[in-house]
Amino acid sequence: MLRNYILITFRNIVKNKIFILINVLGMGIAVACCIVAYLNWEFSSNFDKHHVHAKNIYRIQSYQDYQGQRNRHALAPIPLGSVIKQNFTDVDRVVRYTASQSNFRIGDEVFGAPMAYADSAFFELFSFTLKSGTFVALHDKSQILIADELARKYFNSEDVIGRQISQINNGVLKEFIVGGVFAVQPLNSSFAFDAIALWDNQWDVTEDKTSGDSDWKNMSTLFIQVKDELRVAGITKQLQAYIEPQNNTREDFKLSEYYLQNFETLAANFYGETWLAGEQLRWGFPPSAIVGPGIMAIFLLLLACFNFTNTSIAISGKRLKEIGIRKTMGGVRGQLIFQFLSESMILCFMALIVGALLAEFLVPAYNNLWPGIKLTLKYSENISFFVFLILLLVLTAFIAGIYPAFYITSFKPVSILKGKLKFGGTNWFTRTLLTFQFAISLLCIISGVAYIRNAGYQRDYNLGYARNGIIVATVANVGEFNAYRNALMMNKNINIIAGSKDHVSDKYYKQPVKFEATEHQVEIVDVGDDYLKAMDIKLIDGRDFKKDSETDKRESVLVSEAFVKQFGITDDPLGKRLLWKDSVQLYIVGVVSNILTDGFWKAAAPVMLRYVGPQQYTQIVVSTSPENLLEVNDYMKETWKKISPNTLYSGKYTDGNMYAAQMINTNAVRIFGFLGVIAALMSATGLFALVSLNILQKLKEIGVRKVLGASAANIVRVINAEFMVILLVASVLGGLLGYFMTDKMMDAIWEYYLPVNFMTLGICIGLLFVIAIITVGYKTIATAWMNPVNSLREQ
């Protein structure tokens, strides 16, 4: 019996090869997208799962309650680690950890790499693969462990035990001996360092080399291991006794509560109700990056299943006699249903093979979209993935084949064999499915066009400071700043050179400021001479800082419009007195336009600019014209090598800080563009199949109409009338869905974006109609001009 089912299936494939090919290709594309979505989910869900002790590791985090908002912080006071070691008997291990970018020198080559400092028990707590050497090297202050990729890149070998590597701190070299080489961590790991040394080494680069571990002002990431989960509540309660020592040393930063966050959930909990400040680990994926691809894949799979169902019902008219005879010969309905579901399973299996082949191309393309993702296709090594494919096959075959199987086998053999029953083409169900197909296609097209327009909008949006033609580099001290500035002044393409301690786009700090009875957290940027001119920050009231003015350094500030608004200053803000750190009196001497320190992500925050002298400069800001940007950057890089040969050039474009927003826009355009094209093609092919089969059902009617004098235009209207109605309904449904869903997506990502407007909707709906007209145009026109004699003779 099974053999007969297979033979019948392949006979029907040959008879309807064009329509079957359309279905298999469409479903294959949908299956490939489902594979990518599953791998994306699996990659995220396995974040940090390779660490053996992950379930027993906790990070000490804290809450800060301020003005009704509970802020989260990932760091804990460094002395708390020693306190826990000495007094908390329920804690099995304690590890302090901190990480930052560092400069290194191997031979004559200077390079930058992420560097970590940790207590000696770090590798006892976390699972790393050792390639050579020993993890015990972390107990030795003179040794360093490096990643295998770093060893291969700069030593051209992994056999580097005993080799020397120099860390550069403020131009001073600190020598290390390589004591171990570890395999670089996967991208779904919290740790992203390429080198790690014993915790005590970090104090060698500070001015005060003795009090670092005992000063409650100093913060770091703090891990503890608790093997018995029942002890966690008691440990959390014990920790609250050490809130006071920290708060006594930080009047500007008072914590409310310590809490423990399980290591396995760190990545998932990064995106909570409030921003997790002070994160030193690799961020996890936002929920939208996990759920989004899955929803898109489901949309495409539904489109493919709709196509399959529509086509199956449409071509079923050719198989009525087969069904009638089989029922007359004793065939029961259950056998026929099983046969149709078997045919669906075989076609879906073919689509699964096509999807697996397409996934070989889609997975690398998806990896290229996101720098923090590396999906891999491993069928034999990943049992859960293999199970997913089987479940996907069964589910797809069931969804696509269940309705046609029950519908086609429901008719009585007498009606079929007497020729009283004829169906095919479209019915209410196929019309509904086609409507949803085009609605989903329109949704994807609207999203793609909206993100394209938004990319241009955000590219030109005024952030309150210059984004183009600005290069910012780090300097160690005033001597280095002066030497570098003097050398750069020789370049005629450089317009302005300014000094600063902070920078509006990526380096500032938050502290409470009080005006009369109102207190708010504000973003404070310490700037130097000519900073406003270099960054093109608009002064809308008052004056700029006076050069070398000790009074301005001590008590003058510039504030943003958002600052004035949030503090409720309704009259002239100039001269108003502010209170900072509970005792420092500051006076507003100028108001600048809003500065979007967080780019498009958040609403303009209240910003306060303070004036600092050259002794505090850590940044040099260079302004040039956009067309000279590359040439000036090259000049700065070469000049830096002469000024500070032991330090890596750190220059970066200010516009580069908008990279994340640009990447999201670009990738959203690519993803929704791909989905829109695929969805439109699926809908178009489904429409083509239904129109073709509908024409076959109406050949006699069309022939009679032409004999009776109907024009070609009238015939085209008869053929396409119901499909135009379907498109109109789909346009309304898809337009509404596209408008609201796209706006919700953008609103969840950005504060400043270009909403979907009527022009976008009009363009997309027009594009959908053009696709539909092109799809059915040739077929309907050819039918309208055919000789009626031929169709009537055949009928």
Ranges and model annotations:
Residues L2-I6, R11, K15-N16, H51, ...:
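Membrane-helix entry/capping segments
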Residues I6-I22, G26, F306-L347, S410-L421, ...:
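Intracellular coupling helices
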Residues I13, N23, S44, I60, ...:
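Generic structural signal for small/hydrophobic residues in well-ordered secondary structure
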Residues K15-E42, G284-K321, C348-F349, I353, ...:
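Hydrophobic alpha-helical transmembrane segments of multi-pass inner-membrane transport and secretion
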Residues I29-Y58, V363-P371, I440-N468, M745-W750:
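Alpha-helical transmembrane segments
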Residues V36, M345-F411, R453, A721-W785:
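Small-residue-rich transmembrane alpha-helices
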Residues S44, K55-G112, A121, R152-S157, ...:
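Hydrophobic, regular-secondary-structure patches
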Residues D119-S132, I144-F285, N486-A661:
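Mid-to-C-terminal secondary-structure elements
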